[in-house]
């Protein structure tokens, strides 16, 4: 009877040990590799750079086996969510990135990671076929031309910088007299451009013609009146994927990333 008891105890001990050994250790569970297909790199920014950013994100995501999620549009539409889960923030101008860091997204951006990616030039978009025969800023300063501009987002003061670049005050005055509406952002300007055909000219960046080629022809501004603003990107302080975020930013400046941005109207460095 005693022998049977000892055998039973030993059997229980052996089974317990086997059960313990069959379970992965807590350390092993902690260090187990993450399934890449579940990784999402969340990236937020304005609508202007979005077409190029989305295409580049798709290529990078396929190469890495992850998803790069691009949320773009006017800042108020995404800033609250970005404060909760953004890994990266991209901008449509240098002052926009500064506004993000100092005002719109307080404490979110790691300012040491901000980098400038690409520039795009200012341009005049006209109705298909250019019925008014617009050739540049001189023409849009003349009476009888109705202009749409953006006074916000990445274009604060853009029209004034363009019109006044050569120091001709009459040209600035002429352009101002012809402005029919100051849109708060490019998205609102695009809606008005497509719905109100009384506008002859949309003073904007070249990239918007690439984004919607059927709605406008591109007329380059005279070199002496052309200005440039940038797209930049930065990693957030809250991101748990900083290394991956840096890899994506690096990719945007790679040969493949550059080709994508050039395709969408941005300038190669």
For each predicted feature, which ranges?
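Positively charged n-region of N-terminal signal peptides that target proteins for export
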Residues: 1-4
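Bacterial N-terminal signal peptides
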Residues: 9-20
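Exported/periplasmic ABC-transporter solute-binding proteins
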Residues: 22-24, 28-69, 76-84, 93-94, ...
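Short acidic (Asp/Glu) patches
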Residues: 104-110
């Amino acid at each position: 009877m005693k022998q049977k008891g000892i055998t039973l105890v030993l059997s229980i001990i052996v089974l317990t040990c086997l059960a313990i050994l069959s379970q992965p250790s807590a350390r092993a569970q902690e260090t187990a590799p993450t399934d890449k297909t579940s990784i999402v790199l969340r990236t937020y920014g304005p609508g202007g750079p979005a077409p190029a950013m989305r295409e580049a994100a798709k290529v990078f995501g396929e190469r890495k086996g992850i998803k790069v999620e691009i949320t773009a549009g006017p800042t108020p539409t995404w800033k609250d969510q970005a404060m909760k889960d953004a890994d990266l923030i991209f901008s449509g101008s240098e002052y926009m990135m500064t506004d993000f860091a100092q005002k719109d997204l307080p404490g979110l951006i790691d300012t040491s990671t901000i980098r400038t990616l690409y520039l795009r030039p200012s341009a005049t978009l006209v109705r298909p076929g250019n019925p008014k025969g617009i050739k540049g800023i001189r023409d849009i300063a003349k009476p009888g031309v109705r202009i749409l501009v953006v006074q916000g987002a990445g274009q604060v003061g853009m029209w004034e910088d363009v019109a006044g670049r050569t120091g001709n005050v009459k040209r600035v005055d002429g352009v101002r007299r012809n402005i029919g509406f100051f849109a708060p952002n490019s998205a609102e300007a695009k809606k008005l451009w497509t719905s109100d055909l009384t506008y002859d000219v949309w003073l904007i960046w070249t990239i918007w013609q690439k984004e919607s080629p059927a709605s406008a022809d591109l007329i380059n501004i005279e070199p002496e009146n052309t200005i440039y603003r940038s797209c930049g990107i930065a990693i957030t302080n809250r991101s748990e994927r900083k290394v991956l975020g840096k890899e994506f930013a690096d990719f945007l400046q790679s040969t493949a990333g550059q080709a994508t941005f050039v395709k969408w109207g941005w300038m190669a460095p």
